[in-house]
Amino acid sequence: MRDVIKLVSSAGTGHCYYTTKNKRTMTEKMQMKKYDPIARKHVIFTEGKISKGGGK
């Protein structure tokens, strides 16, 4: 089963990407090198928690 995960920038800009991963085959936290438009360079994005809040 594929679960939605959030990739958070390690540059500390607050920028994030959302993607899916198969938890059965990838049990460790995902890390990817992607472009951060706020920092204007490629940085490592690590898997973070998705908040379940309703906005209030």
Curated annotation (Swiss-Prot):
GO terms for MF: structural constituent of ribosome
GO cellular component terms, A-Z: cytosolic large ribosomal subunit
Top-rank taxon: Bacteria
Family annotation (InterPro entries): Ribosomal_bL33 (IPR001705), Ribosomal_bL33_CS (IPR018264), Ribosomal_bL33_sf (IPR038584), Ribosomal_zn-bd (IPR011332)
Gene Ontology BP terms: translation
Keywords: Ribonucleoprotein, Ribosomal protein
Residue ranges of coiled coil: none
PROSITE patterns per UniProt: RIBOSOMAL_L33 (PS00582)
Family: Belongs to the bacterial ribosomal protein bL33 family.
PANTHER family: 54S RIBOSOMAL PROTEIN L39, MITOCHONDRIAL, LARGE RIBOSOMAL SUBUNIT PROTEIN BL33M
HAMAP family the UniProt entry points to: Ribosomal_bL33
Identification of the protein by name: Large ribosomal subunit protein bL33C
Source organism of the structure: Sorangium cellulosum (strain So ce56) (Polyangium cellulosum (strain So ce56))
Source lineage: Bacteria, Pseudomonadati, Myxococcota, Polyangia, Polyangiales
